[in-house]
Design a protein with these regions (language model features):
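Conserved nucleotide- and phosphate/pyrophosphate-binding catalytic cores
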Residues: 21-231
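NTP-dependent nucleotidyl-transfer catalytic core
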Residues: 1-8, 16, 23-28, 41
Length: 231
């Protein structure tokens, strides 16, 4: 018996026919439906959307975010395929997706389950801590060096411009401003935070003692635009 995804049916059929011709034996093939994205695309390296189990290729935080970003239209199928969550709970999560899609309860349940299953509870807690820091619901200064490293690897980043350690040119380097003047204007408008702390001085400098995990600084423009300046 040879098994494979639905797109391998042709190869399986050819193999079965070859064995029949060469040995006279009857063999069998079994295919399963492809697991696809909301756009109907399959997962894979060639499609550019592969998700890795190896933490050196995909950090637990990035792994967690992958599942958290699952589309509403496929979340029920993913829960049934990838988890051992009970039917009743899955149906409840699907109902929640319809009634309160903004809460993303189903996506959170899937992301937690998969991250804990693959990487363990400790890395799940790290992924949750990084998520809270990135989305502004927790103080990033409490992150461990390992958590900071995972966060830095998933954000736009730039090497520290050490010419005076001024914040403004570093905001330009990391893509949060187009020019030093714009960067200083944003700071003056209270639109910039460093490590979760608002900055008011347009000529503020980055202090080495304020680095997160000895790695660098988390900078944010507004609520959703982030970057990481590496020391």
């Amino acid at each position: 018996l040879q098994t494979g995804a639905l797109d391998q049916w042709g190869n399986i059929a050819v193999g079965a026919d070859l064995i029949r011709r060469l040995d006279g034996d009857i063999v069998h093939g079994l295919t399963t439906p492809l697991i696809t994205t909301a756009n109907g695309e399959k997962f894979g390296k060639s499609e550019g959307n592969a998700i890795w189990l190896d933490s050196t290729l995909c950090s637990p935080y990035k792994f967690y975010q992958f599942w958290l970003n699952s589309d509403d239209s496929v979340i029920g199928n993913y829960l049934r395929v990838f988890t051992e969550i009970s039917r009743e709970e899955i149906e409840d999560l699907e109902d929640s997706t319809i009634r309160e899609p903004h809460k993303r309860r189903a996506q959170v349940a899937l992301a937690k389950y998969m991250t804990q299953f693959v990487h363990g509870d400790s890395e799940l807690q790290t992924a949750l801590a990084v998520s809270a820091a990135v989305f502004g619901t927790a103080d990033p200064r409490g992150l461990s060096p390992a958590a900071v490293s995972q966060m830095a690897d998933t954000l736009p980043s730039a090497k520290l411009d050490t010419t005076g350690y001024d914040l403004a040119p570093n905001l330009v380097k990391v893509g949060l401003a187009k020019s030093n003047n714009e960067a200083r204007r944003l700071i003056g408008d209270n639109a910039i935070t460093v490590n979760g702390i608002g900055v008011k001085d347009p000529y503020a400098k980055l202090e080495m003692r304020d680095q997160l995990g000895g790695i660098g600084w988390l900078v944010r423009r507004g609520r959703k635009t982030l970057g990481f300046i590496r020391s």
